[in-house]
């Protein structure tokens, strides 16, 4: 029985506390495809993602892993082949003020004929300026998980499909490690068990009492990275984490 469950619907209707997984580039861009929707719905999470990428772009680091499929080592440029877990950000799920356009007052308002009417109009404009914000509706409290599967983006710059799949396998292994480390840390209060993973979660604004929920995702790599979904699905099944994959009806993107 497959541990990957595929359904039709809207990924962003995932239950409260769910972790939404999507494939990312390492340049700090959520510019197109479903990534643009992530950026719109979770702007605070996007800022954390972008800062994470810029850190490695400014101070490059590499790490080496032996690829069992090729029986040889390969150097990864961080954050390539890793996973970034971003806890729910209050600015993303709490109602937020939104800027509202204002009408500029007329330059001759209150001058010459009709001065009284000009004053009254000015008062109306003053009152309208006080209503400068509209509240954005509250969103769901979702975790965001970024799998860094391609170094760059764009048809001519993205990584080749085989490299994207290797990066996906590596990133899923990293995700499993982080989930296990966080679970171990939450089961004891000993400072000795604190891991770099939990420190990273705290640094991004997460609360230790927050628990990572179900894993939900889109058809990873199948959109702008143009990797056949069945190939990525096989990698996810090998990784061993149960994930619900949501595909919009009639849609063919990631």
UniProtKB/Swiss-Prot annotation:
Instruction: Please explain the role this protein plays, according to its UniProt record.
Output: Highly specific phosphatase involved in the metabolism of ADP-ribose 1''-phosphate (Appr1p) which is produced as a consequence of tRNA splicing.
User: Which residue ranges does UniProt annotate as crossing the membrane?
Assistant: none
One GO biological-process annotation of the entry reads:
peptidyl-glutamate ADP-deribosylation
EC number of this enzyme: 3.1.3.84
* Enzyme kind, highest EC tier: hydrolase
Q: Which PROSITE patterns match?
A: MACRO
List the signal peptide residues: none
Q: List the SUPFAM superfamilies.
A: Macro domain-like
Reactions accelerated catalytically? ADP-alpha-D-ribose 1''-phosphate + H2O = ADP-D-ribose + phosphate
Keyword field: Hydrolase, Protein phosphatase
The molecule here is called ADP-ribose 1''-phosphate phosphatase
Ranges for region Disordered: 86-125
Question: Macro domain spans which residues?
Answer: 1-254
Entry GO MF terms: phosphoprotein phosphatase activity
Q: Which residues bind substrate?
A: 9-11, 23-25, 30-35, 220-226
Which portions of the chain have biased composition (kind: Low complexity)? 91-102
Q: Which superkingdom?
A: Eukaryota
- State the family it belongs to: Belongs to the POA1 family.
